Amino acid sequence: IPPDQQRLIFAGKQLEDGRTLADYNIQKESTLHLVLRLRGGMQIFLKTLTGKTITLEVESSDTIDNVKAKIQDKEGIPPDQQRLIFAGKQLEDGRTLADYNIQKESTLHLVLRLRGGMQIFVKTLTGKTITLEVESSDTIDNVKAKIQDKEGIPPDQQRLIFAGKQLEDGRTLADYNIQKESTLHLVLRLRGGMQIFVKTLTGKTITLEVESSDTIDNVKAKIQDKEGIPPDQQRLIFAGKQLEDGRTLADYNIQKESTLHLVLRLRGGMQIFVKTLTGKTITLEVESSDTIDNVKAKIQDKEGI
């Protein structure tokens, strides 16, 4: 076996050519391990968060799993606690070094993953992103406490939003299907939340706890939580005006104890616009099956024509 294809290992360490057996404290009847180096083997470096650099002998064809196993051999860190980063990207276990174009003497970064834990990101309205170490079983209360530890914001002033939904304190991250590296949005709750009322066509009145800064989307999500009505079937009316999703309650001057009206949008309903000769645009809620007579009747209801 040509020397350049031999790698000798003793006590978990690869032996360097210029050193002596005595340097490695190899005594009589010691056992060395011979590993064949495929042509094309190479060295890469791993940098930990503590600043320590580890050198690994690898092949381009090694998978990320293999690399993590080598790190375990050297450092004793279980693979499931290792995250490897290269060129700003987290490396996936089944892929090879070649897949990521990792070449000889490349440097990877090793980040430790807490047991069963994961990282999530929290983005504030100022654009700042906070990184948190969490567990899937953490409640929203726990997450708010972690944010308080990092940022000093009292939990009762925090509102956390994920996938357009405000997260409730007693629920867990798993309940909301929040997974590793998900991004939550943090909105500060101004002291001064308020109650508003939502009246349905059946005459039922729903009470909601809201903030002036809540968007109409948020309000519809709260109605969904209470009543199970999907937001896309809700139309909210205040002072004769249909409220638009991206706007806030403050935009419409909706104050404490205001009453909104909830109209259900039939599945398959749609909005169309009618432009008059004066340039005014009227919005109509219609169904594809509406006749032109129906449409004219709706225009009469709205405009008296």
From Swiss-Prot:
Cellular component terms (Gene Ontology): cytoplasm; nucleus
Residues annotated as domain Ubiquitin-like: 1-41, 42-117, 118-193, 194-269, 270-305
SMART domains for the chain: UBQ
Record Pfam families: ubiquitin
Cross-link position per record: Glycyl lysine isopeptide (Lys-Gly) (interchain with G-Cter in ubiquitin): 89
Keywords of this entry: Cytoplasm, Isopeptide bond, Nucleus, Repeat, Ubl conjugation
Iron found in the keyword field: no
Location relative to the cell: Cytoplasm; Nucleus
Molecular function as annotated in GO: mRNA binding
Family affiliation: Belongs to the ubiquitin family.
Purpose: Ubiquitin exists either covalently attached to another protein, or free (unanchored). When covalently bound, it is conjugated to target proteins via an isopeptide bond either as a monomer (monoubiquitin), a polymer linked via different Lys residues of the ubiquitin (polyubiquitin chains) or a linear polymer linked via the initiator Met of the ubiquitin (linear polyubiquitin chains).
Further comment: For the sake of clarity sequence features are annotated only for the first chain, and are not repeated for each of the following chains.
Protein name per the record: Polyubiquitin
